[in-house]
């Protein structure tokens, strides 16, 4: 029995790569502010100060790490983990400066941690000091058995899979498995709910073979918009890079996106703990359709812009060595047959001594290449998958990732494949925001689209009839009121004190018109 219990017990710490101004830190939140520099009220980033030459003097999410005090990792004894950097705050004192997703002397502890057993789930969250807000299970804020307790800054909640609204899904992700999912809200001001609040979603998976493992998806979305937004998911597998679509200069992407809007692709390296350089080797785009309707173009091939890429990309492929990151500026476009633009990128990451990520000499004029030259697996046309550098999403949602990988060319260990999707509208036309669909989806989408209801002929006729009836009623009421006022004005009251009784009101005849 003990052996079975141990097989079903799993404790997995969340592994979040360092991304500047990630979900754990937002300078717009109460108790989270920039140590130096200024807070960007648009995206919650800290804009770090620079010297007279425009070179940054500080970095980290809160701009609290003075670059001049960063020292070799060896001086911190055992190296800093999870992207932490060794620095010297005072002469002869060496410490690890952790990314915002981790804490501890060596940055060894994740701020979000989930523990799963065969019967219960435990959520642990260590907020960035100084936290004075509130943490609670969604829809169970006042339920005692679902409450978080605080000890030394750590907030913890433990409950069974039958409590607190835990969602149970059988045969997921594989046949015989059981998945349990629960969400918590982190409110940084106990009395105010803002868009900068967080939603934590933990998911435990009990393997149908009797073994247990955890795939915890702890991401962040606005609590007050949690039904509208897609969670930014942090997987247990290490992701060295991410794919982000941004507005010009890194601003939030405009909504909606119209043809000609200035955008950029931003691919940052999560941290420099293992890899220090990156290079985009291929970038393809398609219209999200299937079979004969699929349109695909290659923008980057072998690290160089193609002829199509030269036409669509603004300037050259640039980089931000401070992160480091790849930046590709472009003006919003779309391909024939669909407003959706799907990007598939192949990115190579390198360690310090590896020269394969160095820049290459590109041909002139740019090369013309066939579509999908290296068979980059596109994102599922009917279901937008999250970026998963280690596991290429299967085209068939019913096929497990492991079986799908056996059918496709796997990416090398130092290469990741990323996917992202953008919807672009044409402001010159009166089109509506619709996703491409199969014929089998038409009926369900019509039922779900409120515009279909509003455009119903019968309802429009009824609305017009009601409007006409109301107008006629107002006209009739106005005429009656005017007639009554005229009758009152035509009467003159004459009072005669010599008349003992009777009606003292005399009607004066009016001249005929």
UniProtKB/Swiss-Prot annotation:
Glycosylation sites noted in the Swiss-Prot or TrEMBL record: 438, 503
PROSITE patterns, from UniProt? EGF_1, EGF_3, ZP_2
* One GO CC term on file: extracellular region
Q: Where in the cell is it found?
A: Secreted
Instruction: Outline the extent of the EGF-like domain.
Output: 72-108
Question: Which tissues does the record link to its expression?
Answer: Component of the acid-insoluble organic matrix of calcified layers of the shell (at protein level).
InterPro entries documented for this protein: Cuticlin (IPR051962), EGF-like_dom (IPR000742), ZP_dom (IPR001507)
- Alphabetized Gene3D superfamilies for the sequence: Laminin
Q: Provide ranges: composition bias, Pro residues.
A: 375-396
- Kindly state which keywords UniProt assigns to this record, in alphabetical order: Disulfide bond, EGF-like domain, Glycoprotein, Secreted, Signal
Q: Which cysteines are joined by disulfide bonds?
A: 76-86, 80-96, 98-107
Residues making up the signal peptide according to the UniProt record: 1-21
Residues of the ZP domain: 115-364
What residue spans carry the region label Disordered?
356-411
Q: Which PANTHER family match?
A: GH04558P (PTHR22907:SF54)
The entry's protein name is: EGF-like domain-containing protein 1
- The organism encoding this protein is Lottia gigantea
């Amino acid at each position: 029995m003990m052996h079975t219990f141990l097989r079903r017990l799993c404790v997995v710490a969340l592994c979040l790569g360092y991304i500047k101004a990630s979900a754990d830190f937002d300078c717009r939140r109460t108790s989270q502010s920039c140590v130096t520099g200024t807070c960007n009220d648009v995206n919650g980033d800290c804009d770090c100060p620079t010297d007279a030459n425009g070179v940054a003097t500080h970095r980290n999410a809160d701009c609290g790490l003075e670059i001049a005090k960063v020292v070799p990792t060896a001086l911190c004894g055992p190296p800093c983990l999870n992207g932490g950097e060794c620095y010297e705050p005072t002469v002869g004192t060496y410490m690890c400066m952790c990314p915002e997703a981790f804490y501890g002397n060596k940055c060894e502890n994740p701020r979000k941690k989930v523990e799963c057993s065969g019967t219960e789930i435990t959520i642990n969250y260590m907020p960035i000091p100084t936290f004075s807000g509130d943490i609670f299970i969604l829809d169970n804020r006042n339920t005692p058995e679902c409450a978080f307790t605080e000890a030394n800054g750590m907030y913890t909640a433990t409950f069974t899979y039958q409590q607190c609204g835990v969602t149970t899904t059988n045969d997921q992700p594989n046949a015989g498995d059981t998945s349990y999912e629960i969400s918590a809200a982190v409110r940084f001001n106990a009395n105010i709910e803002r868009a900068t609040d967080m939603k934590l979603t933990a998911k435990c998976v009990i393997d149908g073979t009797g073994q247990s493992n955890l795939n915890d998806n702890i991401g962040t979305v606005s609590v007050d918009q949690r039904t509208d937004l897609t969670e930014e998911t942090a997987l247990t597998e290490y992701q060295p890079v991410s794919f982000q679509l941004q507005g010009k200069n890194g601003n939030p992407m405009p909504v909606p996106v119209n043809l000609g809007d200035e955008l950029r692709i931003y691919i940052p390296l999560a941290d420099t703990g293992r890899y220090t350089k990156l290079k985009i080797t291929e970038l393809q785009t398609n219209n999200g359709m299937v079979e004969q309707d699929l349109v695909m173009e290659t923008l980057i091939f072998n690290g160089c812009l193609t002829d199509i890429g030269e036409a669509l990309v603004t300037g050259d492929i640039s980089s931000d060595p401070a992160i480091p990151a790849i930046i590709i500026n472009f003006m919003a476009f779309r391909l024939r047959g669909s407003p959706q633009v799907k990007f598939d990128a192949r990115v190579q990451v390198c360690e310090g001594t590896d020269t394969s990520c160095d820049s290459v000499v590109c041909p002139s004029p740019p090369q013309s290449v066939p579509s999908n030259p290296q068979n980059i697996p596109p994102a599922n046309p009917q279901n937008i998958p999250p970026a998963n550098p280690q596991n290429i999403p299967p085209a068939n949602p019913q096929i497990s990732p492991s079986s799908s990988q056996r059918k496709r060319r796997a990416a090398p260990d130092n290469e990741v494949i990323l996917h992202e999707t953008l919807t672009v509208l044409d402001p010159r036309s009166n089109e509506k925001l619709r996703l491409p669909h199969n014929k089998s989806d038409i009926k369900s989408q019509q039922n779900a689209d409120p515009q279909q209801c509003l455009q119903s002929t019968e309802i429009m006729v009824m609305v017009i009839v009601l409007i006409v009836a109301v107008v006629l009623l107002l006209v009739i009421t106005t005429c009656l009121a005017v007639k009554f006022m005229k009758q009152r004005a035509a009467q003159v009251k004459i009072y005669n004190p010599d008349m003992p009784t009777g009606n003292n009101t005399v009607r004066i005849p009016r001249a005929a018109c």
